[in-house]
């Protein structure tokens, strides 16, 4: 019996740590009583061995063994590269 790991698609929010990125995944939920839909962003710490993902990239992550206290995901592939707009200093 083959065990298939969970995969998610999200965008990179932060890449300031060494070999770690923060990925945001938007989840749309419906309130059980009022039936209103609302959006939540779930944040995951993801292991990026080669430091290849940058802010704004759309990536696929896959579940893996625990790498640290909060890292249970690793980078599978980069789907699209993001465009970073640098803020101009006045």
Curated annotation (Swiss-Prot):
GO terms for molecular function: rRNA binding; structural constituent of ribosome. One of its GO terms (cellular component) is cytosolic small ribosomal subunit. Disulfide bonds: none annotated. The keyword GTP-binding does not apply. GO terms for biological process: translation. InterPro entries: NA-bd_OB-fold, Ribosomal_uS17, Ribosomal_uS17_bact/chlr, Ribosomal_uS17_CS. Belongs to the universal ribosomal protein uS17 family. Part of the 30S ribosomal subunit. One of the primary rRNA binding proteins, it binds specifically to the 5'-end of 16S ribosomal RNA. This is Small ribosomal subunit protein uS17. The gene is rpsQ.
């Amino acid at each position: 019996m083959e065990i298939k790991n969970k995969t998610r698609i999200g965008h990179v929010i932060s890449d300031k740590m060494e070999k770690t990125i923060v990925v945001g995944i938007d989840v749309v939920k419906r309130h059980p009583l009022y039936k209103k839909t609302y959006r939540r962003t779930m944040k995951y710490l993801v292991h990026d061995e080669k430091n290849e993902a940058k802010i704004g990239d759309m990536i696929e992550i896959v579940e893996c063994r625990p790498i640290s206290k909060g890292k249970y995901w690793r980078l599978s592939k980069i789907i699209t590269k993001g465009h970073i707009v640098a803020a101009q200093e006045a």
